[in-house]
From Swiss-Prot:
Name of this chain's protein: Small ribosomal subunit protein uS3
Subunit-structure text: Part of the 30S ribosomal subunit. Forms a tight complex with proteins S10 and S14.
Organism encoding this protein: Clostridium tetani (strain Massachusetts / E88)
Keyword list, A-Z: Ribonucleoprotein, Ribosomal protein, RNA-binding, rRNA-binding
Keyword Transmembrane among record annotations: no
Length: 222
């Protein structure tokens, strides 16, 4: 069976950038990696209702900077910035060596075309016992109205309470997964239903992006 590579990982260094921007030696690399994972899981769980699309982590010396992409920045910031200060205080228990934590909030302008937020929206509807077909089709229709080139959704698990788990796909438009210059956004979420977990995947094609050409200077020996 053909398997799908992660669309973001395939395009890193071509048209996509890293979600973690730091360098560490062999001694500290694994600690930083685990710490990054713990930070992402904690922030996602703490402000899940704010619609967190992604979290970029930058490290430099004793400083850790988080770029949190969210559909509802007001929920993360809180009244007078109280939400961010509370988040910083709790993150200090996760981050080692008393590092200085900086939080930058970036607003996601169009939640209807963000793959991660779309997947979470479908998962939330499944938890409310809404039909998976209806949830998937409505999400696709809203996204296509926003002017994207294509979208595909997949739901896996005991759909509709069936005894045998299966996967169902719906798509509209084009999804060129193998074209590296194609800007493919990918999102994954899980719905906890009474029949067990249902996995939701969303692929969004936003058009082609031409990678920036590096200028090659030719040295002419006189």
């Amino acid at each position: 069976m053909g398997q799908k590579v992660h669309p973001h990982g395939l395009r890193v260094g071509v048209i996509k950038d890293w979600d973690a921007k730091w360098y560490a030696d062999k001694k500290n690399f694994s600690d930083n990696l685990v710490e990054d994972n713990n930070i992402r899981n904690f922030v996602k769980k703490k402000v899940y209702a704010a619609g967190i699309s992604k979290i970029e982590i930058e490290r430099a010396g004793k400083r850790v900077k988080l770029n949190i992409y969210t559909a509802k920045p007001g929920m993360v910031i809180g009244k007078g910035g109280q939400g961010i200060e509370a988040l910083k205080g709790e993150l200090k228990n996760i981050v080692s060596d008393n590092k200085n934590i900086l939080i930058n909030i970036v607003e996601v302008k169009s939640a209807e075309t963000d793959a991660q937020l779309m997947a979470e929206n479908v998962a939330q509807q499944l938890e409310k016992r809404i039909s998976f077909r209806r949830a998937m089709k409505q999400t696709i229709q809203r996204a296509m109205k926003s002017g994207i080139k294509g979208v595909k959704t997949a739901c896996s698990g005991r759909l509709g309470g069936a005894d045998i788990a299966r996967t169902e796909f719906y798509h509209e438009g084009t999804i060129p997964l193998q074209t590296l210059r194609a800007d493919i956004d990918y999102g994954f979420a899980e719905a906890d239903t009474t029949y067990g977990k249902i996995g939701v995947k969303v692929w969004v094609y936003k058009g082609e992006v031409l990678p920036a050409k590096k200028e090659v200077k030719e040295e002419v020996n006189a």
